[in-house]
């Protein structure tokens, strides 16, 4: 009998994210304290685990592969965050994105609607695809990713991430 079979890169991503969950439930802060807003109240949730099963590419390319992402954020005072995401990029290469960000709640006066922007360093677009992202040097490049989300409940949300001129990523987030 075959149980759940994942490609090795996806299995590694899942294992890393699951291994990080117990650590994030502790009171220790993993993000540098200077990233939070001094004097702002502590966030109501410790962190967020995000999963993206689907990415829509603007241009159809036979080289494109399915993109799967697993990310974990630590929430900081002042609606700031830092985190790391593990994903298979558009060409099937294992990739990582370490980032800091800001979340803007109550977008357009709607409590469920929010926007988020993250900025950081990405690694993973290596030969022969190093020219597929701007400012790439040996697989390392800066990245800025804006997104819009909708809170389904106090813990659950869906988000759309705008990946430059390349794609839209659809994801589900669970705060803990």
Please state what every model-predicted region is.
Residues 1-42:
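Cleavable N-terminal export/targeting peptides
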Residues 25-76, 85-86:
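Short glycine/proline- and aromatic-enriched beta-strand/turn motifs that initiate or cap beta-hairpins
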Residues 45, 64-70, 78, 92-98, ...:
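Residues that define the transmembrane beta-barrel architecture of outer-membrane proteins
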Residues 45-51, 80-82, 113-117, 158-160, ...:
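Transmembrane beta-strands of outer-membrane beta-barrel proteins
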Residues 53-55, 166-176:
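Outer-membrane beta-barrel "beta-signal"
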Residues 63, 116-143:
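Outer-membrane beta-barrel translocator/channel fold
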Residues 73, 101-105, 149-151, 173-175:
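Transmembrane beta-barrel domains of outer membrane proteins
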Residues 75-79, 105-110, 153-155:
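Outer-membrane beta-barrel channels and translocator barrels
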């Amino acid at each position: 009998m075959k149980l759940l079979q994942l490609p090795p890169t996806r299995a590694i991503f899942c294992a890393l994210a699951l291994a990080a969950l117990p650590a994030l439930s502790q009171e220790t802060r993993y993000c540098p304290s200077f990233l939070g807003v001094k004097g702002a109240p502590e966030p109501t949730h410790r962190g967020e685990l995000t999963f993206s099963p689907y990415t829509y590419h603007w241009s159809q390319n036979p080289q494109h592969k399915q993109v799967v992402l697993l990310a974990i954020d630590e929430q900081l005072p002042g609606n700031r965050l830092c985190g790391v995401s593990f994903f298979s990029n558009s060409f099937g290469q294992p990739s990582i994105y370490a980032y800091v960000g800001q979340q803007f709640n109550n977008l357009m006066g709607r409590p469920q609607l929010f926007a988020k922007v993250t900025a950081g360093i990405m690694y993973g677009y290596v030969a022969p695809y190093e020219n597929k992202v701007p400012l790439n040097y040996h697989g390392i490049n800066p990245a800025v990713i804006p997104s819009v989300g909708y809170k389904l409940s106090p813990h659950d949300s869906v988000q759309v991430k705008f990946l430059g001129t390349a794609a839209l990523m659809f994801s589900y987030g669970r705060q803990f």
